[in-house]
UniProtKB/Swiss-Prot annotation:
The gene is rplW. Keywords: Ribonucleoprotein, Ribosomal protein, RNA-binding, rRNA-binding. GO terms for biological process: translation. It comes from the Bacteria. The lineage of its organism: Bacteria, Bacillati, Bacillota, Clostridia, Moorellales. This is Large ribosomal subunit protein uL23. Part of the 50S ribosomal subunit. Contacts protein L29, and trigger factor when it is bound to the ribosome. It holds the Pfam family Ribosomal_L23. One of its GO terms (cellular component) is ribonucleoprotein complex. One of the early assembly proteins it binds 23S rRNA. One of the proteins that surrounds the polypeptide exit tunnel on the outside of the ribosome. Forms the main docking site for trigger factor binding to the ribosome. The keyword rRNA-binding applies. Belongs to the universal ribosomal protein uL23 family.
Length: 96
């Protein structure tokens, strides 16, 4: 059993994710091997909130070049978490 700190890597703050906060949705980068149930339990334990829904998506790493050498960024998994009305996550406060 992994700890919540191993499942949730960090909050993802972008222009789109700050717009979703108006709908009580928060975006996180999560461990690629984590499933929706693990993500839900980790968010509820870390932030003491009630999660209604979890949407996940895998984002493929982009190709990057340095001179004549080509590489690829790592793949990553995002989770968009919908909270119960009235619940807020303090990490995101002040960003709206």
């Amino acid at each position: 059993m992994r700890t919540p700190e191993e499942i949730i890597i960090r909050p993802l703050v972008t222009e789109k994710s700050t717009g979703l906060m108006a709908d009580n949705k928060y975006t996180f980068l999560v461990d690629p091997g984590a499933n929706k149930i693990e993500i839900k339990h980790a968010i509820e334990k870390l932030f003491n909130v009630k999660v209604l829904k979890v949407n996940t998506l895998m984002e493929r790493g982009k190709l990057r070049r340095v001179g004549r050498f080509q590489g690829r960024q790592s793949d990553r998994k995002k989770a968009i978490v919908t909270l119960r009305p009235g619940d807020k996550i303090q990490v995101f406060e002040g960003l709206e």
